């Protein structure tokens, strides 16, 4: 189980939003590439990046920053937010992004997902499922799709998708712990899903609980605010999970 440090980009700064509310942002750094270098030094092997400008409007304001990050870091990157066309995907593929996260487009144009898997391969396409009160949210969490997340996942799974990031919006940025039950249930329903947990991870104890409650089957867990505010030691958390995996 990997620990994925998260960086959310808004106007070329690293920020965090409270429950996806763009009016409730905290700016953590105006040099996101320096933060990623620190994460890399602490042992992270995969970094989770969200382009919040693109997630909301479909237009990125952060392409130069993403390019700079990739130039300065050797760690793998996964990127989400506003990736809604094959041309978008080709652009980020050209920058060297390892995993492309599709959210809104997967809900509104599932045929694009099929094309993406065909072009880039099953292991490089990740579906971002952002859920609140059981329903999938789109367009930077601002729109309710009216689709139950379990139905949506069943559809994606049937199309060959095996990599999923599931975000519990109600937990995001609240530092209240993750929804471990939801992840355990999803892995029971879809046993070979490479599932990443997102939302609420605020301590190494949360990571251990996720590992234990899913019998080590979780692919990874994303955490951002807890790292920035000193509540989660990234290096120590990675060490603990590595130890558990080796037992």
From Swiss-Prot:
GO terms for molecular function: 1-(5-phosphoribosyl)-5-[(5-phosphoribosylamino)methylideneamino]imidazole-4-carboxamide isomerase activity. Its EC number is 5.3.1.16. One of its GO terms (biological process) is L-tryptophan biosynthetic process. CDD domains: HisA (cd04732). Its main location: cytoplasm. It holds the Pfam family His_biosynth. It is found in: Cytoplasm. The active site is at residues 8, 130. It catalyses: 1-(5-phospho-beta-D-ribosyl)-5-[(5-phospho-beta-D-ribosylamino)methylideneamino]imidazole-4-carboxamide = 5-[(5-phospho-1-deoxy-D-ribulos-1-ylimino)methylamino]-1-(5-phospho-beta-D-ribosyl)imidazole-4-carboxamide. Keywords: Amino-acid biosynthesis, Cytoplasm, Histidine biosynthesis, Isomerase. Pathway: Amino-acid biosynthesis; L-histidine biosynthesis; L-histidine from 5-phospho-alpha-D-ribose 1-diphosphate: step 4/9. GO terms for cellular component: cytoplasm. InterPro entries: Aldolase_TIM (IPR013785), His_biosynth (IPR006062), HisA_bact_arch (IPR006063), Isoase_HisA-like (IPR044524), Isoase_HisA-like_bact (IPR023016), RibuloseP-bd_barrel (IPR011060). It comes from the Bacteria. Belongs to the HisA/HisF family. This is 1-(5-phosphoribosyl)-5-[(5-phosphoribosylamino)methylideneamino] imidazole-4-carboxamide isomerase. The gene is hisA.
